[in-house]
Amino acid sequence: MSVLIIAGLDSSTGAGLARDLAVMAELGLPARIAATAVTAQDSAGGCLLHPVPAAMVAAQIHAAGPVRAAKLGMLADAEIVAAVADSLPPVPTVLDPVLATSAGVGLIDAAGLAAMIALLFPRATLITPNLPEAALLTGLPEATAPDRLAAALFARGARAVLLKGGHGKGAEAVDWLCRPDAPALRLASPRKPGTKRGTGCTLASAIAGHLALGADLPTACARAKAHLDGWL
């Protein structure tokens, strides 16, 4: 029943592997990890990033043994992306396309981003971009309608997209689960005041956890949204 978490280590423990592991503990699921990078992050938004060698990332994935689902977070560069693509087991996989810290510090280079789209979008069961990430991935404005953003991501190889609305406006935080062969599913919760790090990690890990528990994709997304709302 283990879930494989492939992500970076955030020294502040506010996001990344620490947050992913906390979610697995909350769900009562064992986890296996593959660290892609070590970061030094502080409360002022500073971030130093040291990628783990791609061969070591692959070795960690192979050492994990059998798992029921996987969650991918920060991947740092093209060599790591390629190692993950070559080593990833054939299980339901949630890709959180982490592009930058909450303070705007980049966490993947241009070659890594291109490799992520080419190698991992077609492999992932679901990708979970927020609105700024969806805009960067598609070249469209953040205000573009969800169905158009999703269509542009499908054209780049994505199989299913959860567009996260936490960066939007209004009384509700609205996420849209979009699939090429089904109507879009609206998932809404009351918008909480302020900001909190680790929301994307929490949601993606919770989805992966519920997929490991046997839920279908819409159910896993709905349960994960409720889990995130409870944490906030």
Where are these regions (language model features)?
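Short pre-catalytic strand/loop immediately N-terminal to key active-site residues, enriched for Gly-Thr
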Residues: I6-S12, A184-G198
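Conserved phosphate/ATP/ADP-binding segment of small-molecule kinases
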Residues: I108-A184
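Phosphate-handling active-site elements
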Residues: G28-R32, P183-L185, H210-K225
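Nucleotide and nucleotide-moiety/phosphate-recognizing core
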Residues: E79-P92, R159, P180-A184, G194, ...
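Short, well-structured alpha-helical segments that form the helix of a local strand-helix-strand
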Residues: P146-F154, D216-W231
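Conserved N-terminal subdomain of the carbohydrate kinase-like
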Residues: M1-I5, L17-S102
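Short glycine-enriched, charge-decorated loop/helix-capping segments at active-site entrances
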Residues: G45-V52, V105-A110, G139-E142, K192
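Short, small-residue alpha-helix embedded
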Residues: V23, A135-L136, G194-L217, C221
